Amino acid sequence: MSEMTPREIVSELDSYIIGQHKAKRAVSIALRNRWRRMQLDEALRHEVTPKNILMIGPTGVGKTEIARRLAKLANAPFIKVEATKFTEVGYVGKEVDSIIRDLTDSAIKMVRLQSIEKNRFRAEEMAEDRILDVLIPPAKNNWGQAESTPEPSAARQAFRKKLREGQLDDKEIEIDLAAAPVGVEIMAPPGMEEMTNQLQSMFQNLAGQKQKARKIKIKDAFKLLIEEEAAKLVNPEELKQQAIEAVEQHGIVFIDEIDKICKRGESSGPDVSREGVQRDLLPLVEGCTVSTKHGMVKTDHILFIASGAFQVASPSDLIPELQGRLPIRVELQALTTEDFERILTEPSASLTEQYKALMATEGVDISFTADGIRRIAEAAWQVNESTENIGARRLHTVMERLIEDVSYDASEMNGQSVTIDADYVRNHLDELVADEDLSRFIL
């Protein structure tokens, strides 16, 4: 798991997300507390439960982006789910338990990759030996078995040197490689994905691991053999134990659009996709044991981060028990013109950088002036105010409209330069921004 300090986490998030300092501080402290908890003795560690977070803010201000970037920083099992995809147990739709199953699957994949990376050096040596066995077959005894020689021959060493230097990369060899598993597609009704996965695993295990002779270039064979040999060095049972422990101790679940499962108004009858989902989420958030195909997983110490716009509903519309399980509330602010300006220029791979790079592939040099960027930001803010406020996503719409002519003619403009200043922006956008009906449908 990540050992970054809260200040380092916030600094890293600042490279991609503008503003929202309170939300960044909250998630950075929560992430650091995961590390702090692991430094405690076992008896006390078991008593320290994570403080789950509820992020509240309008659409397009960075809630989901914080989750995406946090997933990369966490170096821990992480899953992002949409609350609207789930229904109450017993009804058609995904059950909330599938969140933990998916989290465990992602942990298995993460631990397997780490284990393969750890054994890469040995796997490379074993892959080299298999290729050399094809290039220089070992001597055989009277029973047709390969003789084990105490010292490798000079010819074998010479070929190993050539192989490492890449001199044999384009040479084709015929070698036995693991055959691709037969894909078994099983159609199952919604909510029965777990049964489908188990049936697919069963059919693949019945087929067994077969070898198939393939004619392939050495450089391609080397990559496949490394994966094959590294997989042999991984202990499946140990892998499952490590993955389950990683989920239980370091797992993070991000639940987006939680405001969409709030109960609205007085209604009779079962509300299976709203209040029913909240009731099913409760045991997960407060701690229970979920059965997965890899084993039983306890959710007591999994960190849950929920987010929602809460434009129609409010956090108080969540059932009281779930409100109590999300003790840390963070409100994200709506974006201003100044925020839009910074979003266009400051983050890594900002929108302006992306468009410059895209047009450079056609030999067109695009440059943005400070007053041009200011005018783009003002146009985006103005449209958000007069129509629906969709936050920073409005910049994508405005930029596409602005660059449309250049994008269309770029293939015929090789070697030309285009400067996007305030006048250019006014000529291309002002008419649309001023006409509310046009901006509603086009921007």
From Swiss-Prot:
Entries under CDD domains matching the protein: RecA-like_HslU
Keyword set, alphabetical order: ATP-binding, Chaperone, Cytoplasm, Nucleotide-binding, Stress response
Recorded coiled-coil stretches: none
GO terms of molecular function: ATP binding; ATP hydrolysis activity; peptidase activity; proteasome-activating activity
Binding residues for ATP: I18, G60, V61, G62, K63, T64, E65, D256, E321, R393
Entries under InterPro entries matching the protein: AAA+_ATPase, ATP-dep_Clp_protease_ClpX, ATPase_AAA_core, Clp_ATPase_C, HslU, P-loop_NTPase
Subunit structure: A double ring-shaped homohexamer of HslV is capped on each side by a ring-shaped HslU homohexamer. The assembly of the HslU/HslV complex is dependent on binding of ATP.
Full protein name: ATP-dependent protease ATPase subunit HslU
Protein species of origin: Pectobacterium carotovorum subsp. carotovorum (strain PC1)
